[in-house]
Amino acid sequence: MARIAGVDIPRDKRVEVSLTYIYGVGPTRARTILAQTGVSPDIRVKDLEDGDLQKLRNAADDFTLEGDLRRQEGMALKRLQDIGCVRGRRHRMSLPVRGQRTRTNARTRRGARKTVAGKKK
């Protein structure tokens, strides 16, 4: 397996698809990296030459990827929570952040239902 940005990318897939295994690289960024390096998106990783792999590594280093990106996102969430803004409080309470309704729905964000005893008649 070839290693780019500290990630083993699959050898048998096309380069364009293999690059998306790196956290922070989606289809668009993968195409951008390939365009910068001049590597064909249709070639398989196992068929790449060492020079091409090195070009891909250097191009990937220009972006914030993997651990650094995860750390940045975590720090951004922590900052929102520390300043006490609405978005930070909603993150802390595990509720939807962007104004969605919560009286019904929002089950993914709120978690499994907690059964509450009904009123006796």
Swiss-Prot record:
The keyword Ribonucleoprotein belongs to this UniProt entry's keyword annotation: yes
PROSITE patterns reported in the protein's UniProt record: RIBOSOMAL_S13_1 (PS00646), RIBOSOMAL_S13_2 (PS50159)
Ranges annotated as biased composition (Basic residues): 100-121
Xref: Pfam families: Ribosomal_S13 (PF00416)
Cellular compartments per GO CC: cytosol; small ribosomal subunit
SUPFAM superfamilies linked: S13-like H2TH domain
Annotated segments matching region Disordered: 97-121
Keywords from the named record: Ribonucleoprotein, Ribosomal protein, RNA-binding, rRNA-binding, tRNA-binding
Cited InterPro entries: Rbsml_uS13_C, Ribosomal_uS13, Ribosomal_uS13-like_H2TH, Ribosomal_uS13_bac-type, Ribosomal_uS13_CS
Any single GO BP term: translation
GO MF term set: rRNA binding; structural constituent of ribosome; tRNA binding
Purpose: Located at the top of the head of the 30S subunit, it contacts several helices of the 16S rRNA. In the 70S ribosome it contacts the 23S rRNA (bridge B1a) and protein L5 of the 50S subunit (bridge B1b), connecting the 2 subunits; these bridges are implicated in subunit movement. Contacts the tRNAs in the A and P-sites.
Record text on subunit structure and interactions: Part of the 30S ribosomal subunit. Forms a loose heterodimer with protein S19. Forms two bridges to the 50S subunit in the 70S ribosome.
Family of this protein: Belongs to the universal ribosomal protein uS13 family.
Protein's name according to its UniProt entry: Small ribosomal subunit protein uS13
Species annotation: Parasynechococcus marenigrum (strain WH8102)
